[in-house]
């Protein structure tokens, strides 16, 4: 459910004119999003191919214009596009970019002098996105992703969170400690078939994650949704009697078109600059 909502968010910034061509989207031919307007044309029926092309365009545009990994564009794209995009040029480019983004900071054989390591939020989230993508595409964690996990365990605090995580009220990614913890808990659940997750360092880090979640129960609907997602891959995060309660809470704010309004899932800090 949350995967679908993130996917809808990704595609909503594109008009239909971007989606008529069947040519594969690449870093070289992608189109930037057009301005949102109240009068933009809407489809009469949902089109999955159009949605995937819009996601490809969005991911490639963000990669080229910002050269980083973020939750609202190419980060969750690595998860949401995996099932249908394992051979899509844009998806393969995004996976390669994510590996190259993180490798110099976690692989001693590829370190670059003078390169500043990205902030905790970038390293942690990219590790989680890559881990889930690796499992969906390859069925196992890559060596770079394993090294990235080892890195984020070293900067994880005893509380279980990453206390240097930037918080500038840009929910859900840069708003609180809960997002990073639940995202990594999800990634470990998805990767549970990989032997790395049973290693001492991963097991100890996972205990810290669970300690944080016990002492910081979810408050917003988004936090509950993230844990419901993780609970689909592991049974040690949410009690069975709580799952139905949280599901009902999320469905109670679902709109008639099947989606959700993102600010309604967060706290007061998720409002736009105009207060809406």
Positions of predicted regions on the chain:
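Bacterial N-terminal signal peptides
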Residues: 5-17
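Preference for long, amphipathic alpha-helical scaffolds in soluble/luminal domains
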Residues: 19-276
């Amino acid at each position: 459910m949350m995967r679908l909502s993130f996917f809808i968010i990704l595609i909503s910034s594109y008009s239909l004119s971007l989606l008529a061509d069947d040519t594969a989207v690449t870093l070289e031919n992608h189109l930037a999003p057009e301005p949102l307007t109240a009068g933009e044309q809407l489809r009469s029926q949902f089109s999955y191919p159009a949605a995937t092309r819009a996601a490809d365009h969005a991911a490639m545009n963000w990669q080229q214009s910002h050269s980083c990994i973020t939750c609202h564009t190419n980060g969750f794209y690595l998860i949401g596009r995996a099932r249908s995009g394992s051979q899509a040029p844009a998806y393969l480019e995004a996976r390669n970019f994510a590996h190259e983004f993180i490798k110099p900071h976690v692989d001693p054989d590829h370190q670059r002098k003078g390169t500043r390591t990205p902030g905790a939020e970038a390293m942690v989230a990219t590790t989680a996105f890559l881990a889930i993508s690796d499992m969906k595409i390859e069925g196992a964690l890559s060596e770079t992703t394993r090294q990235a996990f080892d890195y984020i365990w070293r900067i994880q605090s005893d509380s279980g969170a990453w206390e240097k995580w930037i918080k500038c009220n840009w929910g859900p990614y840069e708003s609180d400690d809960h997002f990073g913890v639940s995202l990594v808990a999800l990634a470990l659940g998805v990767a549970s078939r990989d032997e790395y997750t049973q290693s001492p360092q991963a097991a100890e880090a996972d205990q810290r994650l669970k300690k944080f979640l016990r002492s910081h129960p979810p408050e917003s609907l988004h936090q509950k949704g993230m844990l419901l997602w993780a609970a689909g891959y592991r049974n040690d995060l949410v009690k069975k009697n709580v799952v139905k309660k949280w599901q009902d809470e999320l469905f109670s704010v679902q709109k008639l078109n099947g989606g959700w309004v993102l600010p309604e899932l967060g706290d007061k800090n998720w409002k736009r600059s105009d207060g809406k």
